């Protein structure tokens, strides 16, 4: 093990970024470069030999799985949708939301003989949910505003991430089932855990202690 080796941490851009930075600052890491990004792609904490990279959620999984990053911070939604090979080591208790089934108020989950159409950004999560219920559905992959699908009769219902439910209510949609809770997770590359066990375990423990204090 090289104690001076730089540990690379991949952070999810967007809603989880701020929460992750707050956590790392509170365990003593220097995240100042992340607050003055400019056009930089890699952000350094020279004192602690840490590099941060900001990438889209699916790419966090890819970077960590292939060893381009040692540690990743990503939402459980992405982990459930994209099965990859790494260690999931911590629930960070931030970025909390849930997967929910929603539609217009007249929707009936088990009524009728027609195969239901379900619109979602998360086809694998949706497929598994209905498989467990023994319901055969057609899944329509949507990249944009999923809430439009039942309103425009593209789909009977949607499966999407819900934080407050405000967007659903504003569009006349109702939650029919909460599928599972979601929050930010810490993941670690398998080889990195062996090669840099002491340093990575130290980071994990410090983050765990902080999360437990704040929970």
Swiss-Prot record:
Keyword entries, A-Z: Amino-acid biosynthesis, ATP-binding, Cytoplasm, Glycosyltransferase, Histidine biosynthesis, Nucleotide-binding, Transferase
Pathway named in the protein's UniProt entry: Amino-acid biosynthesis; L-histidine biosynthesis; L-histidine from 5-phospho-alpha-D-ribose 1-diphosphate: step 1/9
Cellular component aspect of the GO annotation: cytoplasm
InterPro entries: ATP_PRibTrfase_cat (IPR013820), ATP_PRibTrfase_CS (IPR018198), ATP_PRibTrfase_HisG (IPR001348), ATP_PRibTrfase_HisG_short (IPR024893)
Protein's cellular compartments: Cytoplasm
Enzymatic reactions: 1-(5-phospho-beta-D-ribosyl)-ATP + diphosphate = 5-phospho-alpha-D-ribose 1-diphosphate + ATP
UniProt cross-references to Pfam families, sorted A to Z: HisG (PF01634)
Function (record text): Catalyzes the condensation of ATP and 5-phosphoribose 1-diphosphate to form N'-(5'-phosphoribosyl)-ATP (PR-ATP). Has a crucial role in the pathway because the rate of histidine biosynthesis seems to be controlled primarily by regulation of HisG enzymatic activity.
NCBIfam families linked to this entry: hisG
PANTHER family in the record: ATP PHOSPHORIBOSYLTRANSFERASE (PTHR21403:SF8), ATP PHOSPHORIBOSYLTRANSFERASE ATP-PRTASE (PTHR21403)
Protein family (similarity comment): Belongs to the ATP phosphoribosyltransferase family. Short subfamily.
Identification of the protein by name: ATP phosphoribosyltransferase
Lineage: Bacteria, Bacillati, Bacillota, Clostridia, Eubacteriales
């Amino acid at each position: 093990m090289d104690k001076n080796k730089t540990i690379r941490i991949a952070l999810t851009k967007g809603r989880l970024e701020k929460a992750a930075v707050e956590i790392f600052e509170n365990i003593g890491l220097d995240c100042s470069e992340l607050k003055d990004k400019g056009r930089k792609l890699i952000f350094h904490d020279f004192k602690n030999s840490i590099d941060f990279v900001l990438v889209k959620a699916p790419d966090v999984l890819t970077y960590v799985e292939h060893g381009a990053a040692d540690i990743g911070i990503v939402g459980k939604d992405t982990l459930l949708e994209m099965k990859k090979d790494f260690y999931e080591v911590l629930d960070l208790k931030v970025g909390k939301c849930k997967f929910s089934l929603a539609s217009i108020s007249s929707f009936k989950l088990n009524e009728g003989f027609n195969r239901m159409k379900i619109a979602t950004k998360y086809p694998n999560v949706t497929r598994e949910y209905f498989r467990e219920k023994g319901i055969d559905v057609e899944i329509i992959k949507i990249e944009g505003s999923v809430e439009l699908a039942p309103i425009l009769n593209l789909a009977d219902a949607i499966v999407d991430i819900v934080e407050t439910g405000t967007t659903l209510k504003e569009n006349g949609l109702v939650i029919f089932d909460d599928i599972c809770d979601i929050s930010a997770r810490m993941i670690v590359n398998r080889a990195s855990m062996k090669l840099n066990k002491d340093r990575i375990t130290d980071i994990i423990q410090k983050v765990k202690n902080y999360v437990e204090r704040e929970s």
